[in-house]
From Swiss-Prot:
Sequence segments annotated as region (Disordered): 1-42
Organism of this sequence: Caenorhabditis elegans
Pfam families: PseudoU_synth_2
NCBIfam families tied to this protein: rluA_subfam
Entry keyword annotation includes Disulfide bond: no
Alphabetical list of Gene3D superfamilies matching this protein: Pseudouridine synthase
UniProt keywords, alphabetically: RNA-binding
Superkingdom of the source species: Eukaryota
Alphabetized InterPro entries for the sequence: PsdUridine_synth_cat_dom_sf, PsdUridine_synth_RluA-like_CS, PsdUridine_synth_RluC/D, PsdUridine_synth_RsuA/RluA, RluA_PseudoU_synthase
Annotated catalytic residues: D199
GO biological process, one term: enzyme-directed rRNA pseudouridine synthesis
Polar residues compositional bias, start-end: 1-14
Identification of the protein by name: Uncharacterized protein K07E8.7
The family this protein is said to belong to: Belongs to the pseudouridine synthase RluA family.
Length: 432
C-alpha cells in the first residue's frame, strides 16, 4: 500500500543542476472527551504520541494487524515550498490518501486551524511560520502482528529488534502502528529518543536514547563517523565476487513521497557491498554504510544493477529498461519523476472506483452555498464513526501484497569502540 499521492508540477524535485474496514468502534479512546487542543505555546513542540488514543479496537487476520479507524489531529508548520501558495492547493498535493477535493471541503467544514484559529477561507495563502492543525478520520495502514524484541536496556539506552512493516515514528497514515506507538500503547513506554531510523519495511537493530545527554552523545559520535553500520540485503542477480563500493550522490526525486535517486547535485553517500552467497538468481549481500542518506542502500544497489529483491519502489521497470542501473533511465528527469509518482499514487490501491463518492466530493467542493463549520468545541466522541468525506470510509482498498510488509533489508549490527548491538541473521539471509 503506497503512502503517496499526486504532487503538483511545482512540487516536483528540482532538476539536477549538473553539480557534483468500516466497523463500529465499541471502545472510546481515553482522551475522547477532550476538545481540540490549540498551540498554546508557539514554541512548544507537541508530541503526537501524547495524543494517541490508548484503546482503539483492532483485529488480526492471517497474521496482519488491522486497526479500527479513529479521529486524530495532524499538526504541521509551513514548509518553505508552501509559502505564498493557497493552503487547500498545498494540502491537495501533499496530504496522503485523500480525494483531490478533500482539503477544500475540510476547510469549508472548519476542520483546519491556522495559528490556533479555525480557518474556513479556501483562498487562504500560507505564510512563513503558520502552525496548522487538521482534524481528520485516520485509517492506519495494517502491519504484521510481530513482536518488538528487546535486545538491551540500560539507564541510558533502549535497543530493540524492529520487525518489518511498521515505521519507527508517526508519519502519514501511521501512528499507533509504529514502533514508538506500539511501545507506548502496549508497554506504556514514553520519552524515548530516536537515535537513527530504519525504513518502514526494513527490520533490525534500532536504538533509542532514554535521556537528553545520551541522545546528544550518540548523535555527536554518529556525525563524527564513529559508528559502524552493517546491513544484510537480498538482491536480484548474481552479485560480483569482488567488493563493490558505490559513492554516488543521492538526492530527492519526488519530495512528498520521500523517493530518492542518484543525482549529481545530491548529498555525498558511500556504501560497501560484499557478496555472502548466491543461488544463481538472487544474492545475499553484506553492506557497510559510511553515511546515512534516505534509502541509501536501496538506491545504491539499484545503481549497481542489483536492486533489492521485491522492492516495490526501486526494483521496477518504471526506472527504465535496466531498472535504473548506472542511473541510465532512458528518459528525462521530469518524465522519470512523473512516471514514478503515477506508479505510486494512492488511487492505484483502490479495489474499484466509487463514482457516487467522487461526484459528491466534486459537488461539495464546487458548491458556493455557505456551510456551517463544525463547532470548535466538538469532542472526539461527538464525531461520527463514518465520515462522508473520508476516502478510506468510501472506497474499498485492495488487499495489501506481501512485499509491501517486508523488504529484504535488515540492520544486522551497530557498534562503536564502546558498545555493540547485533541481531541474529534473518531467515531469508541464511543459506540453506
Amino acid at each position: 500500500m503506497s503512502d503517496t499521492t499526486d504532487v503538483p508540477e511545482n512540487q516536483k524535485s528540482p532538476k539536477p543542476s549538473g553539480k557534483a474496514d468500516k466497523r463500529k468502534i465499541e471502545e472510546k479512546p481515553e482522551n475522547s472527551s477532550l476538545k481540540r487542543k490549540k498551540f498554546e505555546d508557539p514554541n512548544k513542540k507537541v508530541d503526537p504520541l501524547e495524543e494517541l488514543p490508548m484503546k482503539v479496537p483492532f483485529k488480526i487476520v492471517d497474521g496482519v494487524r488491522h486497526l479500527a479507524p479513529y479521529w486524530a489531529c495532524y499538526r504541521t508548520r509551513t514548509k518553505g515550498r508552501w509559502i505564498g501558495r493557497k493552503m487547500v492547493e498545498v494540502f491537495s498535493g501533499e496530504f496522503l490518501s485523500t480525494n483531490r477535493n478533500y482539503a477544500k471541503i475540510a476547510c469549508k467544514m472548519g476542520r483546519i486551524y491556522v495559528n490556533g484559529e479555525q480557518m474556513t477561507d479556501v483562498d487562504y495563502v500560507m505564510r512563513n511560520g503558520d502552525r496548522v492543525e487538521h482534524w481528520a478520520h485516520r485509517h492506519e495502514h495494517p502491519i504484521r502482528d510481530l513482536p518488538i524484541r528487546v535486545i538491551s536496556e540500560t539507564d541510558d539506552l533502549f535497543v530493540v529488534e524492529k520487525p518489518p512493516s511498521l515505521p519507527v515514528h508517526t508519519c502519514g497514515q501511521y501512528a499507533i502502528h509504529t514502533v514508538l506507538g506500539q511501545l507506548r500503547v502496549n508497554e506504556g513506554r514514553t520519552g524515548l529518543r530516536v537515535l537513527h531510523r530504519l525504513d518502514r519495511a526494513t527490520s533490525g537493530v534500532l536504538l533509542f536514547a532514554k535521556n537528553y545527554e545520551t541522545d546528544l552523545e550518540f548523535k555527536t559520535t554518529l556525525k563524527q563517523g564513529e559508528w559502524s553500520k552493517e546491513y544484510i540485503c537480498k538482491v536480484d542477480g548474481v552479485f560480483p565476487d569482488e567488493e563493490q563500493v558505490c559513492e554516488q550522490p543521492i538526492g530527492p526525486l519526488v519530495i512528498s513521497m520521500g523517493i530518492q535517486c542518484v543525482r549529481p547535485d545530491g548529498k555525498d553517500a558511500k556504501s560497501r557491498f560484499r557478496k555472502l552467497w548466491s543461488d544463481g538468481t538472487q544474492s545475499v549481500v553484506q553492506v557497510h554504510i559510511e553515511t546515512g542518506r534516505t534509502h541509501q542502500i536501496r538506491v545504491h544497489s539499484q545503481f549497481l544493477g542489483h536492486p533489492i529483491a521485491g522492492d516495490q519502489i526501486y526494483n521496477s521497470a518504471v526506472w527504465g529498461p535496466t531498472k535504473g542501473k548506472n542511473a541510465d533511465y532512458q528518459k528525462s528527469f521530469d518524465e522519470l519523476c512523473e512516471d514514478v509518482r503515477n506508479t505510486h499514487k494512492c488511487e492505484n490501491w483502490h479495489e474499484k472506483p466509487n463514482p457516487e463518492f467522487e461526484q459528491r466530493m466534486e459537488h461539495l467542493a464546487a458548491d458556493t452555498t455557505p456551510i456551517t463549520p463544525e463547532a470548535p468545541s466538538l469532542t472526539l466522541e461527538q464525531r461520527p464513526e463514518f465520515d462522508e468525506i473520508c476516502q478510506k470510509c468510501n472506497v474499498e482498498s485492495k488487499k495489501v501484497p506481501e512485499n509491501h510488509f517486508q523488504l529484504y533489508l535488515h540492520c544486522l549490527k551497530y557498534e562503536t569502540k564502546k558498545w555493540s548491538f547485533k541481531t541474529e541473521m534473518p531467515d531469508w539471509a541464511v543459506q540453506k
